[in-house]
Amino acid sequence: MKFESLFFLCLVLCSCTKRESFNHIEIIGHGGMGVEHPMSIYHDNTVESVSLALQFPGLNGVEVDVQLDLDGELWLYHDMELDTETSGGGCIGSLHSNFIMDLNYNTIQGEKLCRLNQIVPLLDSSKVLFIDVKSFNSCDGLAQNPILFLESLNTALSNTKCEVRVIISNTDWLPYFIPFYQTYYSSDQHAEIENNINTHLGLTGVVVRYSSITESQVQSYKNQGLKVFLYEMRSPKGIKRALRKNPDGIIPDDIRRALIEGR
């Protein structure tokens, strides 16, 4: 009888335990539905992946990786070289639009590579679009021209209704983007982050791999007036750990699980 009473008491206490609330933390789909996640139906950074992700209630927006071609077109693509994921080879920065337009991803669906201006109409004023600016062309070993990239970005986003934020990992490019866009610096090196916070006073925030930052470091950046977004969490445990660090947002590769944990 005592055991039954104790068991009942435990049930009552457990049922009354308040669930952790993470509603204040934004959830942003990484490349749409996620990058390199086995449960993703479509390849990341495609129209299909972004469109599907935006149908999930509670998702605040998407992050996409963007690269500039020789003709000034901006394409969604994550890797440095095309032969890792597509039917083509080389680097986007060394190729013309007509060539890239004919490529497909090496997937069952064979999705086409898409331009940035193809996904812009998918996001309304309630959504956020994070643009991860890829500045380096690994085929020639050089960074691209930031002025040309910025001009192409302005053109592609001319009819945008959503909120736009850019992610920059090349320190030299920060001064070009800060005056025009909400700009986030991406790095796992906290000495570099602090240096750029002091050098570029207009920074909006930082984007950091979730395993490379502590809860106290997150709070330290927030105390300096910066927004903090964490990425590269794929497992339920990783998502939970990232949420508990109390960032302003997370960029998970499993948005279904992130929405379960965070909403």
Model regions and ranges:
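Phosphate-group recognition and catalysis centered on beta-loop-alpha active-site segments
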Residues: 16-263
